[in-house]
From Swiss-Prot:
It comes from Thermomicrobium roseum (strain ATCC 27502 / DSM 5159 / P-2). SMART domains: KH (SM00322). NCBIfam families: rpsC_bact (TIGR01009). Binds the lower part of the 30S subunit head. Binds mRNA in the 70S ribosome, positioning it for translation. This is Small ribosomal subunit protein uS3. Part of the 30S ribosomal subunit. Forms a tight complex with proteins S10 and S14. Keywords: Ribonucleoprotein, Ribosomal protein, RNA-binding, rRNA-binding. GO terms for molecular function: mRNA binding; rRNA binding; structural constituent of ribosome. Belongs to the universal ribosomal protein uS3 family.
Length: 223
């Protein structure tokens, strides 16, 4: 039976870029660096659970790791006089044993970020807010912010029902088969007393041609 491919993985190298950018010469080195990446992401999300972090990009030099944190709340990540970001850098360096540079990149429109939208819906479902209301408000906010289309799916024992079911909220168009379409995608799970509720979000930002790809913006660097 056919399955839908991940929209971000389907467009890597065309519209989207990799979140880990490094090269390993040996299999053992690859395994070690892969586990370091997993540790870095797990530690950042654990230390900053409410910082509105969408994604974490990792690049490597010889004895240095550059970590870019994309967040909707840069003030929470940086902290008063940089206290939080300095503490996070020290924790990362003690965990992986290498020098770490932190780059904080602000997400100016969180309504257009699929990960943040999915987390917001999941949090509302956990707090027993109506899932239909949360979906409609999230889709409307994304369209007001400039999205070309939004698709939201929640699945599970909605409202405590005996059998699981699936509910969709679709606004505009989301062309999943168009490779040049810039589609953001995220999956989040909402824990409830009835079990896990799955939340999927697709946000269509329009088509992106190779010459029109946005440049990488610089952020705040902590060394």
């Amino acid at each position: 039976m056919g399955r839908k491919v991940n929209p971000i993985g389907f467009r890597l190298g065309i519209v989207h870029d990799w979140e880990s950018k490094w090269f390993a010469e040996k299999d053992r080195q690859y395994r070690e660096q892969l586990h370091e990446d997993l540790d870095i992401r797990e530690l950042v999300h654990r230390e900053l659970p409410r910082a509105g972090i969408s994604r974490i990009e990792i690049q490597r030099a010889v004895n240095r790791v550059d970590v870019t944190i994309h967040t909707a709340k840069p003030g929470v990540v940086i902290g008063k006089q940089g206290a939080n970001v300095e503490r996070l850098r020290q924790l990362l360096e003690s965990r992986i044993g290498k020098k770490v540079h932190l780059n904080i990149q602000e997400i100016r429109k969180p309504e257009l970020d699929a990960r943040l939208v999915a987390e917001s819906i999941a949090e509302q479902i956990t707090r027993r807010v109506s899932y239909r209301r949360a979906m409609k408000h999230a889709a409307a906010a994304a369209m007001r912010a400039g999205a070309k289309g939004v698709k939201i799916r929640v699945k599970g024992r909605l409202g405590g029902a005996e059998m699981k079911r699936m509910v969709w909220e679709i606004v505009g168009r989301v062309p999943l088969n168009t490779i040049r379409a810039n589609i953001d995608y995220a999956v989040v799970h909402a824990p409830t007393i009835y079990g896990q509720i799955g939340v999927k979000v697709w946000i269509y930002h329009g088509d992106v041609l190779p010459e029109a790809r946005p440049p990488i913006a610089a952020g705040v660097v902590a060394e």
